[in-house]
Amino acid sequence: MSNLKKIEGGVTTPQGFTAGAVYTAIKKRENKKPDVAVLYSDLPCSCAACFTTNKFCAAPVILDREILKKGKARAVVINSGNANAATGKQGIEDARTVEREAEKLLGLGEDEVFVCSTGVIGQRLPVDKVLQGIREIIPAKLAKENGSEAAYAIMTTDTVRKECAYELQLSTGTVKIGAMAKGSGMIHPNMATMLVYVTTDAKADPADLQKMLSAAVDKSFNMCTVDGDTSTNDSIFLLANGASGVEIKTEEDKKAMADLVLAICTDMARRVASDGEGATHLIEVEAYG
């Protein structure tokens, strides 16, 4: 991949993406680090996602699986401090309330906003605080430069912010891809206790994106382990808004794009493993035969 270049940035580096984050005291912190974030695309996105294989998946995962069926979305709302897991029907209703409010504030239709939560399991989501957060963010705090704030907002036991970006020269132009992630404990295949958001300004079919993402996750996040636990909320999203005007159509470009998705997933998987709770070393094993 000689045309691949790592660049400064994160989830808002690709054209057309903005983000914002605020502190709402979902979990009280002395440093008042943000705990609610919104990631938004100016244009409709083709999307793909992979979710936890835990049979007791959290309410946001149940909701997001339904939204994903349309293959299109515009935004993601994320909160840390409360996982909205093991919360029954009420949890699903709460996630839906957050989704609908974000769609109203952004002027979107139904099922255009994914909702994600991470944090304490078994407690009801403090919906009022999440709603307060997204009302503060939309539209006042949505900005290109706030990608790093969003990356901070999704952290729980993480000790470092996790974000990166790449640029790829294709036959018809240049595309960018960015990512942010959280994860440091309960890390075990398949996937881990992680939330990962990958954005690109390439234009691509949802089915092609799903193939690329599933293959990349198998070779990256599904090979991570820290402590042997698989979580209830694991989710990774790939959003492509086409803002670059570069369409992924030829087999050559699809292969290059798939390699790009794998590169950024591998980068983020290493960052997650490196930040494992109590970890002092990162070990990679290559098996042959």
Positions of the model-derived regions?
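Short, surface-exposed loop/turn segments at secondary-structure boundaries that line and modulate
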Residues: V76, S80-K89, D111-Q132, T225-E247, ...
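Glycine-rich, mobile lid/loop segments that gate access to catalytic sites or pores
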Residues: R96, E101-F221, S231
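Glycine-rich phosphate/pyrophosphate-binding loop regions near the starts of catalytic domains
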Residues: V38-T97, P189-L209
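Short, well-ordered amphipathic alpha-helical segments that serve as non-catalytic structural scaffolds
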Residues: F56-I67, I92-L106, Q210-M223, D259-A269
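Carboxylate- and glycine-rich phosphate/diphosphate-binding segment that chelates Mg2+/Mn2+
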Residues: A202-L260
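Short beta-strand elements
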Residues: V36-D42, R65-I67, V77, Y166-L170, ...
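N-terminal amphipathic/basic leader segments beginning at the initiator methionine
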Residues: M1-T52
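A glycine- and small/hydrophobic-rich beta-loop-beta segment
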Residues: N241-G289
